[in-house]
């Protein structure tokens, strides 16, 4: 059985930064270090950080006044920021800079009194944070749509003063169809100068298309609550591959590969390479060939840590 490995795959710059922020905080400060929501959507990563002292909570009321808290990579609403300031919490913001870019866009539309349309998945923490960045005091409203049917039912205050943004981890193909529907219904709608779907999401979706074109089965390493990992699985299925989303190698079933000549492996943006390597090793133990890594875009994006976490440890407290 041939094994193909997608390129790029796994960690993106925003995930690297978010995990590094938690790691640095654990090194520099006395526990407990609180993290609002899973810092990234991966069970292995969250469990590892929890074992080293991070305390994960869903809401700030679980954090004692005056504590250190880290906001997850998915971002938070303005109300959460305000509550943290009110309660004298020391905040390290691990929001992905590409999510922050969308927050800035939404805030500007609100300031201008426009309606905004957010293309995204209801209930996802990134969507909740972005919706919570829209200030309604200037007369505008923000609307959430997930698909073309939502667009069809959408009613806005002024179709000529309307803009859209998107969640950063969506299916590019699905989102393009929703944007087309918006532009058809609202010809004057404004969009971002550059696509809000992040570079890593785009690159991993392109890579899984390349992978699925030559494989019968595709394995996506990622947690069930990872939006971008789910989109990779769906994309492989649309290309007529059997696709499985797995947290780790223990979730694989040898029967998946009966009679299979080729299997592809990729990973969502929050899945660490160690889990991918364990999957590859299990496939080889079951008779697979040495993996062949496909060609792909080389990623060299990096995001810096907050200034307070970049100060050399020897200078902390001086």
Curated annotation (Swiss-Prot):
UniProt xrefs under Pfam families: LYTB
Record-listed isopentenyl diphosphate binding positions: 41, 74, 124, 226-228, 270
Highest taxon listed in the record's lineage: Bacteria
Entry annotation: catalytic residues: 126
EC category: oxidoreductase
Binding-site residues, [4Fe-4S] cluster: 12, 96, 198
Residues involved in (2E)-4-hydroxy-3-methylbut-2-enyl diphosphate binding: 41, 74, 124, 168, 226-228, 270
GO biological process: dimethylallyl diphosphate biosynthetic process; isopentenyl diphosphate biosynthetic process, methylerythritol 4-phosphate pathway; terpenoid biosynthetic process
The entry's keywords: 4Fe-4S, Iron, Iron-sulfur, Isoprene biosynthesis, Metal-binding, Oxidoreductase
Cofactors: [4Fe-4S] cluster
EC number of this enzyme: 1.17.7.4
Binding annotation for dimethylallyl diphosphate: 41, 74, 124, 226-228, 270
Reaction(s) catalysed by this chain's protein: isopentenyl diphosphate + 2 oxidized [2Fe-2S]-[ferredoxin] + H2O = (2E)-4-hydroxy-3-methylbut-2-enyl diphosphate + 2 reduced [2Fe-2S]-[ferredoxin] + 2 H(+); dimethylallyl diphosphate + 2 oxidized [2Fe-2S]-[ferredoxin] + H2O = (2E)-4-hydroxy-3-methylbut-2-enyl diphosphate + 2 reduced [2Fe-2S]-[ferredoxin] + 2 H(+)
Regions crossing the membrane: none
UniProt pathway: Isoprenoid biosynthesis; dimethylallyl diphosphate biosynthesis; dimethylallyl diphosphate from (2E)-4-hydroxy-3-methylbutenyl diphosphate: step 1/1; Isoprenoid biosynthesis; isopentenyl diphosphate biosynthesis via DXP pathway; isopentenyl diphosphate from 1-deoxy-D-xylulose 5-phosphate: step 6/6
One MF term in the entry's GO annotations: metal ion binding
Entry similarity comment: Belongs to the IspH family.
Role: Catalyzes the conversion of 1-hydroxy-2-methyl-2-(E)-butenyl 4-diphosphate (HMBPP) into a mixture of isopentenyl diphosphate (IPP) and dimethylallyl diphosphate (DMAPP). Acts in the terminal step of the DOXP/MEP pathway for isoprenoid precursor biosynthesis.
Protein name as it appears in the record: 4-hydroxy-3-methylbut-2-enyl diphosphate reductase
Gene: ispH
């Amino acid at each position: 059985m041939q094994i193909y490995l997608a390129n790029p795959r796994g960690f993106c710059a925003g995930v690297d930064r978010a995990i590094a922020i938690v790691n640095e905080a654990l090194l520099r400060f006395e526990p407990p270090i609180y993290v609002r929501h899973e810092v990234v959507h991966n069970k292995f990563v969250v469990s590892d950080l929890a074992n080293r002292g991070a305390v994960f909570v869903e809401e700030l009321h679980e954090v004692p006044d005056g504590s250190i808290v880290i906001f997850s990579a998915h971002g938070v609403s303005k109300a959460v920021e305000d509550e943290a300031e009110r309660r004298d919490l020391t905040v390290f913001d691990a929001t992905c800079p590409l999510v922050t870019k969308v927050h800035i866009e939404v805030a500007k539309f609100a300031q201008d009194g426009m309606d905004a349309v957010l293309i995204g998945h209801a209930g996802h923490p990134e969507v909740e944070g972005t919706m919570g960045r829209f200030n309604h005091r200037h007369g505008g409203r923000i609307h959430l749509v997930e698909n073309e049917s939502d667009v069809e039912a959408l009613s806005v205050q002024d179709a000529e003063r309307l803009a859209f943004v998107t969640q950063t981890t969506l299916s590019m193909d699905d989102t393009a169809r929703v944007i087309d529907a918006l532009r058809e219904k609202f010809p004057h709608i404004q969009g971002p100068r550059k696509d809000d779907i992040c570079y890593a999401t785009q690159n991993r979706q392109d890579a899984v298309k390349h992978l699925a074109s030559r494989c019968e089965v595709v394995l996506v390493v990622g947690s069930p609550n990872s939006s971008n990992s789910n989109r990779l699985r769906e994309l492989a299925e649309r290309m007529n591959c059997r696709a499985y989303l797995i947290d780790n190698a223990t979730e694989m079933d040898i029967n998946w590969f009966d009679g299979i000549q080729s299997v592809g492996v990729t990973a969502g943006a929050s899945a660490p390479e160690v889990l991918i390597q364990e999957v590859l090793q299990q496939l080889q133990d079951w008779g697979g060939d040495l993996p062949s890594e496909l060609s792909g875009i080389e990623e060299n994006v990096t995001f810096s840590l907050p200034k307070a976490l970049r100060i050399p440890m020897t200078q902390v407290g001086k």
